[in-house]
């Protein structure tokens, strides 16, 4: 989904950690990365749970430097400009219980993106992405449960090499259902911060279920929780996201 352009002041850096490049396949908007995928790449690089703050849209097919700052923050940089920052985090979040797989299939038929989609090429939830290319996670409402839900069967292109889904794709899958949990009316929102924790990688070809729910709202800020469950209904990963509605052009900044 969309990304939040907000200015950030960088702490003093200590060393260059590594570089990463986001392939065009993994876009959210057409010209920038899906936020959950970006966050997952950074967390995988660091091998720990991180709260990833998106400062600018992460560019595609471009080498990005990852810097380790002296305060423990990781900073992702392009052309000396901070794209994102990440800090170590402990994710405290009680996951909503999942529907069964067939209930999730039924919910996905009510996916709002079938009527209108701001980013139809999104790697995670885009309706123009074909099987084997996009994740095609179409989270539809289940009002009786207070969640949105979607089925997901990971394809072979997501394989880590051991018949399990790579962790950055688990993180990506946990992104967009949160948007549809907090924006059922398809209002414009931008992802500001994303914290994902993966307990266990799901298998390629496994019939998984995703749920998303609203945690709370305050003005333009909306928090969402998401979770992914394996074919046995066991929790495998979860995420907490902060989504922000952009100010209208005439709105005061006070």
What kind of region is each of these model predictions?
Residues 135-199:
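A mid-sequence, solvent-exposed acidic-amphipathic segment
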Residues 1-4:
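Ser/Thr/Pro/Gly-rich low-complexity, intrinsically disordered segments
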Residues 70-74, 217-220:
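Short, conserved beta-turn/loop elements at beta-strand boundaries and strand-helix junctions
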Residues 51, 73-77, 223-227:
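Residue-level detector of beta-strand face positions
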Residues 15-19, 49, 145-149, 193, ...:
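Intrinsic-disorder/low-complexity, polar/charged segments enriched in Ser/Thr/Lys/Arg/Asp/Glu/Gln
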Residues 196-253:
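Accessory, usually C-terminal, subdomains that scaffold auxiliary metal cofactors
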Residues 7-19, 71-162:
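Non-catalytic linker/capping segments at the edges of enzyme domains
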Residues 26, 30-33, 38-65, 69-70, ...:
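Hydrophobic beta-strand-centered segment that forms part of the acyl-chain substrate-binding groove
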